[in-house]
Amino acid sequence: MTQYISKYSPIDFGEYGYDKSFPYCYNGTCKNFSKLMWLVINEKSNPRIDGHKKIVKHLKKNKRKINAQNEHGWTALMIASILSNDWSSIKTVKLLLKKGADPNIENYNYSQTVLKLAASNVKYASNIKTIKLLIHYGADINHKNLLGVSVLHYCYIDYYTKSDNLEVIKLLLSYGMDINSVTNQGNTLLYIVSKVSQNNNSTETVKFLLENNADPNIPNNKGTTALMVASKYSNSTSNLATVKLLLDYEANINFMNKYNETALSKVVSNFYESNYNKNNFMTLKFLIQKGAIDIPIGIDKLSILMVAVIRTYCSENSDNFTKLIELLLKHFNPNIQCSNGKTVLHYLCNKQVCNFPYVDVINLLLKAGINPNIKDNQGKTALILACDNYCFLKNKEAVRLLCKVSTINTIDNTGQSALDYFLNKYKEKYTNILTIILKYGAYCVNKNNINKIKILKCFDYLNKNNKINKIHEKICDQIKLKAIKHQIRPTSLRMKIISLNWYSRSYQTDKIISWNNLDAIDYLGAIDIDDLRYKISDCTKYID
């Protein structure tokens, strides 16, 4: 049995007072405790004092208040039962029942009875002996609270309890409880356990319920079955083993809820709601292998590929999304149209997500044989939708690819082309996109846009000419800068001629005729020393 560690230390309970707040379980406190309730939570507070004897002594004079309720509607029996393995004891529970404590009183927290409270905590502060004792003294095993939850459901009503209550379930079923009883929401115990089988390590409980005639095909009020919820959460609170068990016991793999959702669509819909792990793909592959089909979903009759595209909103999961599409394309037709006439490519091009792997996914769809020229009910192709979507237009390569494979001048029901829609949303930063669209031969139908395109072409020309002029100016500036640096070098021709002029004026002929100055003399083309002096003097006149 799991060792329960108390949240409260008994020394913190303090002296009794009706208006004081005291804990009545591991996660609840309130006022209006009776003295009996206070004695129950303090039964083991002092190891040198027998707390049970104090309770016995108190009941001799105060038996008529045994069923008193505190601020939250809890009785002394509820407190003792839920804590019979911790602050209180099984013998105190038995004493209270013998003295007339009513096991069927409801508290103010969802009308819970003592049996439900003890059953939901049997692996913690309560125990199985307490359950048996309560039933023996007349606790109603078929009681349901305001939510229609019975004690059987309460074994798993806490979805995050990290323990398995199979022992309690077996006990309750041995008393004749209906294994297929439902809550007000229509949830069976199998549905509840299937949803949390990973959290509670309770795949064995799923197997036990199925072996004992739990029906896996009972839908709840939304039409969702145990297989749907297990498949949806197979990457988090449930697991693939539960999905396999349900299918082994003839769960309908293609059962549809009221929204036409199936187990397959539930997995895909939840693909990005939970942290990704390999169970996403394993569950998908398994369901497809077992015969899951692409059933039109919802009012729009969406295909499974459309659901995958629509539900994806996290750009950081783009790699996983590409893998998902690749898997689905191996088994399902990309050219299926929804009730609006759209294909999965329409939904992709209309997706309002930037930094999305549009190019990779379009390539996958094209490889799978999608027709990019299919029109929806409004006569729009995927390219027309893309030209009306800023997020898509930010991806230049995606636009280029779509223009390449599409009939670029298709006209929709309003008489507009892809270029018309692009110009309706045109911004200067999309000039490069305009160039791509025009390159593939796009033209306008709308007369206003025809004039607009002419103006834009002029602006484009001026823009390019302006860029060329700026580049020319930069080149000229660089030439001037480099020329100055070159001219003032000691070894430059300019500096040598200046030096020769100085030597000539000072009649240092021996320094004029030297190996270092031969290139300068050769440049001047002098035929003798007098001609050289003349040409040096003449040349230096023009050096600034």
Curated annotation (Swiss-Prot):
What are the ANK repeat spans here?
A: 31-71, 72-105, 110-143, 147-181, 185-218, 222-255, 259-297, 300-339, 340-374, 378-413, 414-447
Disulfide topology = none
Q: Which UniProt keywords apply?
A: ANK repeat, Repeat
Do you know which PROSITE patterns this protein is assigned to?
ANK_REP_REGION, ANK_REPEAT
Record flagged with keyword Repeat = yes
Q: Which InterPro entries match?
A: Ankyrin_rpt, Ankyrin_rpt-contain_sf, Multifunctional_regulatory
The UniProt entry, under Pfam families, shows:
Ank_2
Residues of the signal peptide: none
Name used for this protein in its record? Putative ankyrin repeat protein L289
